[in-house]
A protein has these predicted regions:
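Oxyanion-binding and handling regions
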Residues: 27, 31-151
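DPxDG-like acidic metal-binding loop motif
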Residues: 1-28
Length: 151
């Protein structure tokens, strides 16, 4: 989902600390894939696209067909029409989205629905390895990140 790099790092540090303290595994899953399988399980045509806002001018796209993920990629908003399937859904992650995404039917996936999808399709979750110790971004990494951040 959306969030700052700092927020992601804080969450990662908190989860890693709890996992080490309690010797518990931490699982990861892809929210786009969970959304796709949720739409599929709700019934109807199994040929559709899931979209989610990404950085400014871009969206994440997942195409789903025949009960499988066809592709998942980040794409420029202006090119969405050529890559999306006719039936498409917007995974609601932000209150405001670009004009190209604002016309798409929104879907929300609850925690209980996420749990049910993961029970039904356990291969969508994987156990995370412990991350390496945190370190500061190099100047080059920082410049690369800052160039992508909306100012």
């Amino acid at each position: 989902g959306p969030g700052s790099v700092l927020g992601t790092r804080v969450a990662s540090a908190a989860v890693s600390t709890l996992a080490k303290m309690h010797k518990a595994p931490v699982f990861e899953f892809d929210a786009m894939k969970i959304a796709a399988y949720a739409v599929f399980c709700r019934g109807g045509n199994s040929d559709f696209s899931i979209l989610a806002p990404s950085r400014k001018g871009f969206a994440n796209l997942l195409n789903f067909s025949n009960a499988e993920v066809e592709c998942e990629r980040e794409i420029e908003d202006e090119n969405l029409a050529s890559f999306c399937k006719p039936r498409k859904f917007l995974l609601k992650q932000k209150n405001t989205v670009s004009k190209n995404l604002s016309e798409i039917e929104e879907i929300e996936i609850s925690l209980s629905e996420t749990y049910e999808i993961l029970k039904r399709y356990p291969n969508l979750a994987t156990i995370c390895g412990f991350p390496p110790d945190a370190k500061s971004l190099t100047k080059r990494e920082y410049v690369k990140w800052k160039a992508q951040a909306p100012i």
